[in-house]
């Protein structure tokens, strides 16, 4: 299920809001119940393969403040939550949230931050698979101005992270590694990775070409550098 609202094109300060709700496994689980199985039974299968049950909610909000004909300020918030239940203790990796890259935290690589204060593994291939979470929050603020013709400059600021619902791992080593990966309101602002940067935009009318350069300001885990601005 998806809901999209876009302001009329005549608005000086337009907004765009998109919210999506998705679920998996509910219909199959209901069939299992009707055929005699218990709702909370684990390891139920469909065609001899276990299936996942989860609900996923994601929302994306963008507002543009038009200053004049050649400059604007754009604010963007992207947040999501996914919850497993019933047949599932774990979520499919492909459905979990991650941050980093050109569309979220532009100074960090894809899956380069989180969950929470998790610093990542030395083995980047393993770390790539583990740096995702059940909860996501990303916000961006970008000022754009025309340089000449179709070429525009941009100055941006990004903040965000992903978190887990809990740290209830059966394996003791996993509990140690993912300590502080759980979402906490009291740590929320300190858990946000921050970056800033500059970029270029070339408007082809049907497509905008982007080039960004970002630098990290704050990492949510211990980097060995003192102070809030601890990126090294």
Model regions and ranges:
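Strand-loop-strand
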Residues: 174-204, 229-231
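Flexible, small/polar- and glycine-enriched "cap/hinge" segments at structural transition points
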Residues: 158-160, 165, 197, 201, ...
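Predominantly the C-terminal beta-signal and adjacent terminal strand-loop region
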Residues: 205-232
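C-terminal outer-membrane beta-barrel translocator/porin domains of Gram-negative envelope proteins
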Residues: 1-145, 155-159, 163-185
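Short hydrophobic "helix-edge" motifs at membrane interfaces and signal-peptide entry regions
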Residues: 147-149, 195-196
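Residue-level detection of beta-strand scaffold positions
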Residues: 143, 154-156, 199-201, 208, ...
């Amino acid at each position: 299920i998806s809901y999209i609202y876009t302001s009329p094109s005549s608005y000086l300060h337009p907004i765009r809001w998109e919210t999506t709700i998705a679920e998996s496994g509910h219909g199959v689980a209901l069939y299992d119940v009707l055929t005699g199985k218990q709702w909370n039974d684990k390891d139920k299968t469909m065609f001899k393969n276990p299936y996942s049950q989860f609900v996923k909610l994601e929302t994306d909000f963008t507002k543009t403040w038009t200053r004049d004909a050649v400059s604007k300020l754009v604010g963007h918030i992207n947040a999501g939550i996914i919850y497993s239940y019933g047949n599932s203790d774990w979520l499919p990796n492909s459905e979990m949230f991650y941050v980093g890259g050109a569309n979220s935290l532009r100074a960090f690589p894809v899956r380069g931050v989180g969950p929470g204060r998790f610093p990542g593994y030395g083995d980047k291939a393993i770390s790539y698979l583990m740096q995702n979470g059940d909860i996501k929050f990303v916000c961006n603020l970008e000022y754009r101005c025309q340089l000449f013709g179709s070429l525009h400059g941009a100055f941006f600021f990004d903040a965000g992270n992903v978190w887990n619902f809990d740290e209830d791992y059966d394996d003791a080593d996993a509990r140690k590694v993912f300590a502080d990966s759980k979402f906490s309101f009291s740590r929320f602002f300190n858990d946000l990775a921050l970056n800033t940067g500059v970029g270029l935009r070339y408007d082809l009318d049907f497509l905008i070409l982007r080039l960004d350069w970002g630098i990290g300001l704050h990492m949510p885990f211990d980097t060995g550098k003192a102070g809030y601005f601890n990126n090294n």
